[in-house]
Amino acid sequence: MEEGFRDRAAFIRGAKDIAKEVKKHAAKKVVKGLDRVQDEYSRRSYSRFEEEDDDDDFPAPSDGYYRGEGTQDEEEGGASSDATEGHDEDDEIYEGEYQGIPGAESGGKGERMADGAPLAGVRGGLSDGEGPPGGRGEAQRRKEREELAQQYEAILRECSHGRFQWTLYFVLGLALMADGVEVFVVGFVLPSAEKDMCLSDSNKGMLGLIVYLGMMVGAFLWGGLADRLGRRQCLLISLSVNSVFAFFSSFVQGYGTFLFCRLLSGVGIGGSIPIVFSYFSEFLAQEKRGEHLSWLCMFWMIGGVYAAAMAWAIIPHYGWSFQMGSAYQFHSWRVFVLVCAFPSVFAIGALTTQPESPRFFLENGKHDEAWMVLKQVHDTNMRAKGHPERVFSVTHIKTIHQEDELIEIQSDTGTWYQRWGVRALSLGGQVWGNFLSCFGPEYRRITLMMMGVWFTMSFSYYGLTVWFPDMIRHLQAVDYASRTKVFPGERVEHVTFNFTLENQIHRGGQYLNDKFIGLRLKSVSFEDSLFEECYFEDVTSSNTFFRNCTFINTVFYNTDLFEYKFVNSRLINSTFLHNKEGCPLDVTGTGEGAYMVYFVSFLGTLAVLPGNIVSALLMDKIGRLRMLAGSSVMSCVSCFFLSFGNSESAMIALLCLFGGVSIASWNALDVLTVELYPSDKRTTAFGFLNALCKLAAVLGISIFTSFVGITKAAPILFASAALALGSSLALKLPETRGQVLQ
C-alpha cells in the first residue's frame, strides 16, 4: 500500500516538473518574437509572460487524504486527497477558466484590459499601494467608477449594436406596454363594472385612485430593490405580481377584493418603468442611447392603443359572459381585464431568455458573470452581421470594490424565518441608505430639481388627460339636456305604456288607471304629478326620478323603482312586490358614452406617435435639455387653445395636439433620469421620481376634474404654470448628451 502511494507522488512531481519546463520555454520563445505588447484600450505596455517562482512543489503533509496520516514524512507521499494532490498555489487554475473566462485579478500582467485611460496595476478593483478597504475615501471610489464607466463604454462599442439589443428592445417593450395598459384598464371597465359591483361615485373614485397608489408604491419598492438584487430578477418578480393579481381581479366578485387585486397589480407594474429604462440603457453605447431609449417609449403608446382597441372589441359583446346562479357573474368586461394581462405574461416569458445587466454585475463585483454576458452580446451581434470569426478580445473588466454586503448567517443559527428576517432587514437598510444617498451632497441639487420637473410634468399631463374626457362628457351632457322634451299638464287615463321613454320631463300630469308594463325609463323625470289606481310591472329605469309626486292605490311589481327615486313624494295605500334584484344604484352602463371613452382614449394615445418619432430622431442631435424644455414650452402654449374648445370635436383635437407635443418632453425626461445617476443609484432614483410622478398625477386629476362644468380657466392656468415652471427647472440641469453612462 505504501509503495503505491510513493509511486503516485513521484509521478505527480515528475508531471509538474515537465509542465513547468514547457511553460518556461514557451514564454522565452514568445518574448523573443514579441517582447512587449500594448493594450489598445489602455495604451499601456506590459510583458506577455513572466517567470514564475515555484516554491511549493507539493502539498504539506497536513493536507493528507487520510486524516490520521498527516505526520508522515513528505517523501512517503500518503498526504494528499483527490481534490488537493498535486496542488501548487502558483499553478492553481482560476475557476472560471474551465469556461474560458479570464480572471478578474488578471489585469495586472499579461492580459488585455478594456479601458479608456491608463490604469496602474489594477487588480480586482484596487490600485497598487492602496490601503485597506476601511481607509478608502469617496474620491478613490469616484475614481474607480469613472474608470469603470470609460472602460464599459469601450466594451459596448466593441460589442457593437445589433441583434442582441433589438431582441432586448422588444422584450422590454412588452414590459413597458404592460404599464401603458394598466393605466387605462380601470377607466375602461368602470362603465360596465359599476353595475355588476354596484359602485357609488366614491367607490369609482377610490378604484381609480388605488391604481396610481399601487404604482407609486411599486415604483419606489422595485426601483430600490433593482439596485441591490438585479434588474432582470426584480423585473421578473414585479411583472409576475402584476400578471397574477390582474388575473385574479378578472374573477373576483366583490368590490373589496377587486380593489385589493388592482392595488397589488399596480404595485407589480410600478416597477416596469424605472427598471426597463435602466436595464436597456446599460446595453447601449453612448451614441445610441438617447435614440433607442426614445424608441422604447413607443411601447407605452402601443399599450394604450392595445387597451382601447381591446375595450372597443370585447366589452360591448354581452354574449361573452356566463352566470352561475345569482352569486357569480362573468361578463365581457372581465374578459377584457384578462386580456389586458397578456402583455405582462408574454414579457415574463421573453425576459427569462435574457441575461442580467452586465453593468449591475460589475457594480457588485461579479466579474465572471459580466464577462460572460458581454461576450454573449458581442458574439450574437457579430454572428448577425456575418462576422462569426471575430473574437471577444476583452480579458479583464474593472469591478467596483464592495464595501457592504448582505448579512449572511449560518444555517444552524435560529429558525428559517429569523434568518430571512435578518436578511430582509439588512436588505431594507441598504435600500434605504442608497435612497438617502440620492440626497447626499453630490446629488442633492440634481435630485431636488428632477423632483420639481417630474412633479410639474406629471401634474399637468395627467391632470389634463383626465380632464379632457370629463369635459367631453360634460359637453355631451349639456347637449343631451338641451334636447330634453317637456310635457306639462298632461292627463292620461286607461292607457298601457309598454315602450321606452327617454330624456323627458313630465310636469303636473295626472295618470289615472294606467298600466306601465315592460316600460324602459331613461333620464325621465316626473314632477308634481298624480298616479292613481296605476300598475307598474317589469319596469327598468336609469336616471329616473319622481319629484313631489303622489301615488294612490298603486302597485309596483318586479320593478327597480327603489326608495331613493321618490324625492319628496307621497305613497298612499301603495304596495311594492318583488323588487328587482341587483344593484339599486343608477348606473350609466355601456352605450354611446362608453364607446366615446374608448374612442377618445384611442385617438389621444395614437396622437403621440409623431412626437415619439420626432423625439427619437432628434434626441441625440439637439440634446436632452433642449428637447425637454422645448416640448414643455410647446405644451404650455397649446394649453391656451383649450379656451376655444366648446364642442366635442374641438376638445378631441386639442387632446391630440397636447399629447403629441408633450410626449417628447417625457421621452427626454426618461433619458435624462437614466443618465444623471450612477449605476448603483439609477433604478433607486428613477423609482423614487416615478413614485413622485404618480403622486402628482393623483393631485392633478383631483384638482382638475373638480372644475369640470364650472370653469376652464383654472385648469388652463394650473397646467400652463406647472409646465412653465418645469421647463425653467429643466434648463438648469446638466446636459448628458455625449457622456458615458456613469
UniProtKB/Swiss-Prot annotation:
One of its GO terms (biological process) is chemical synaptic transmission. Residues 40-144 are annotated as: Disordered. It is found in: Presynapse; Cytoplasmic vesicle, Secretory vesicle, Synaptic vesicle membrane. The chain crosses the membrane at residues 170-190, 206-226, 234-254, 263-283, 295-315, 335-355, 448-468, 599-619, 627-647, 652-672, 686-708, 713-731. Keywords: Cell projection, Cytoplasmic vesicle, Glycoprotein, Membrane, Neurotransmitter transport, Phosphoprotein, Synapse, Transmembrane, Transmembrane helix, Transport. Residues 122-137 have a biased composition (Gly residues). Pfam families: LD_SV2, MFS_1, Sugar_tr. Its main location: other. Glycans are attached at N498, N548, N573. One of its GO terms (molecular function) is transmembrane transporter activity. Residues 191-205, 255-262, 316-334, 469-598, 648-651, 709-712 are extracellular. Phosphorylation by CK1 of the N-terminal cytoplasmic domain regulates interaction with SYT1. N-glycosylated. The modification Phosphoserine is found at S80, S81, S127, S393. Residues 40-49 have a biased composition (Basic and acidic residues). The modification Phosphothreonine is found at T84. One of its GO terms (cellular component) is neuron projection. InterPro entries: LD_SV2, MFS, MFS_dom, MFS_sugar_transport-like, MFS_trans_sf, Sugar_transporter_CS, SV2. Plays a role in the control of regulated secretion in neural and endocrine cells, enhancing selectively low-frequency neurotransmission. Positively regulates vesicle fusion by maintaining the readily releasable pool of secretory vesicles. Interacts with SYT1/synaptotagmin-1 in a calcium-dependent manner. Binds the adapter protein complex AP-2. Belongs to the major facilitator superfamily. This is Synaptic vesicle glycoprotein 2A.
